[in-house]
Regions:
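Catalytic alpha/beta core domains of metabolic enzymes, predominantly
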Residues: 129-276, 286-287, 291
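N-terminal small/glycine-rich loop or linker at the start of catalytic domains
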Residues: 8-35, 149-158, 162
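Conserved, mostly hydrophobic/aromatic
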Residues: 43, 50, 61, 130, ...
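Active-site beta->alpha loop and helix N-cap motifs at the rims of alpha/beta catalytic domains
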Residues: 41, 76-170
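Structured C-terminal cap/extension of enzyme domains
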Residues: 201, 236-240, 259-352
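Alpha-helix-loop-beta-strand connector modules within alpha/beta enzyme cores
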Residues: 68-96, 179, 183-185, 237-245, ...
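Glycine-rich, proline-tolerant flexible connector loops at the mouths of alpha/beta enzymes
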Residues: 56-77, 220-224, 279-283
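Active-site mouth loops of central-metabolism enzymes
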Residues: 22-45, 96-113, 165-170, 191, ...
């Protein structure tokens, strides 16, 4: 992404799109009973409260009445329908793992099977987005967590901690390409969750081959444990490599969330918050998803950055848009065109 002399001025930046992940499938309700919704009614109301606070993208997982993460797509359909009726302008982004939480102590923390995750393209009503990983990778979320991060939570139990230490993301090339085909056919926009620059390069290669032809909404996911860590050096190199036509959100864990989000907002990028990412405000003080959104809105106001409405967020994300082919997609995203047969030198960009 390019930064001009006036790129840090808020009047030249996109309006702020706040993503919230308020369902926290990794946590047990007892970890934060004041903020973890369990009933379907409470889960819908949580979306409403987050939208009213200023979040316009809802990262959605679902819980069963016993408090465990739901692996039933019928429950996803029910929650999507409830949220759509209550806050129709909110962008509904379904977490592509469905649920990675272990069933019981000693069970693995794992994503559901390839075929089951493909069924996200058949959700009804359909969401606006489904998140997608583009490479199989270790997802050891325990690696950068401190004792204070997990104090008083289920992550203090060795079996739970070990399950998340050993978690991997299954996303082989064949599955990724088939998943993108199904999502695009269904009119659902993929939201790429990328762990590092290697994953960004994989996305670019898929665009160049015409595997994906649409707007590029990305999240840089700085979790450590196989992913980039939340170092500003990692962040800035990733930002540098993202094409100008993409929309970039930053994500990390626990008390790194606020400083990373503050940098995102100052640079004209977009933040993500919510209890899936952090339970904490100041050290030792829990902060719920709505309060995290309100904090970001306050910071945005101090920066002079306007917060997008639901309809404006849909325009920024280009929900419902697709492009003709690889060349058209490359032009819209600001990547150099594919090399023509026999062409030497650097292919020059053209206007979209």
């Amino acid at each position: 992404m390019q930064f001009l002399d006036d790129s840090l001025l808020p009047e030249n930046q996109e309006k702020l799109v706040i993503t919230v992940a308020p369902y926290g499938p990794e946590w047990e309700p007892a970890d934060f009973p004041e903020d973890i919704p369990v009933t379907m009614e409470a889960q819908v109301q949580k979306a409403v409260d987050c939208y009213n606070a200023g979040a316009t993208v809802l990262h959605l997982h679902v819980r069963e009445l016993d408090g465990k993460g739901s692996k039933r797509l019928s429950k996803f359909n029910e929650l999507i329908a409830g949220v759509r009726a209550a806050v129709p302008d909110m962008i509904i982004q379904v977490g592509g793992s469905i649920s990675f939480s272990p069933e019981d102590d000693g069970a693995a923390a794992k994503w559901l099977s390839d075929d089951t995750r493909h069924m996200l393209a058949d959700l009804d009503p359909k969401p606006d987005q489904v998140t997608i990983a583009v490479s199989t990778i270790q997802m050891n979320v325990m690696e950068i967590l401190s004792e204070s991060d997990v104090a008083g939570t289920s992550f203090n139990r060795p079996a739970v901690a070990n399950a998340y230490r050993e978690m991997t993301v299954p996303a082989g090339p064949g599955w990724v390409e088939e998943h993108l085909r199904r999502l695009q056919k269904a009119g659902i926009q993929p939201h790429f969750q990328l762990a590092n620059i290697a994953h960004l390069e994989t996305v670019e290669r898929m665009v160049r081959r015409g595997v994906y032809t649409g707007p590029l909404n990305l999240t840089w996911v700085a979790l450590g444990g196989g992913f980039d860590g939340p170092s500003p050096y990692n962040m800035m190199e990733f930002v540098r490599r993202v094409p100008d036509g993409a929309c970039l959100t930053l994500e990390t864990l626990m008390r790194n969330v606020l400083p990373v989000n503050a940098m995102a907002m100052a640079m004209g990028l977009h933040p993500r918050c919510g209890i899936e990412d952090t339970l904490w405000g100041r050290k030792g003080e829990k902060m719920g998803s709505v309060q995290q959104i309100e904090q970001l809105v306050r910071i945005a106001r101090e920066l002079g950055r306007e917060v997008a409405s639901g309809k404006e967020a849909r325009e920024i994300y280009k929900i419902g848009t697709s492009y003709r082919d690889a060349d058209d997609t490359l032009a819209h995203l600001g990547w150099a065109p594919n090399r023509a047969h026999g062409q030497r030198g650097v292919p020059l960009r053209r206007a979209a």
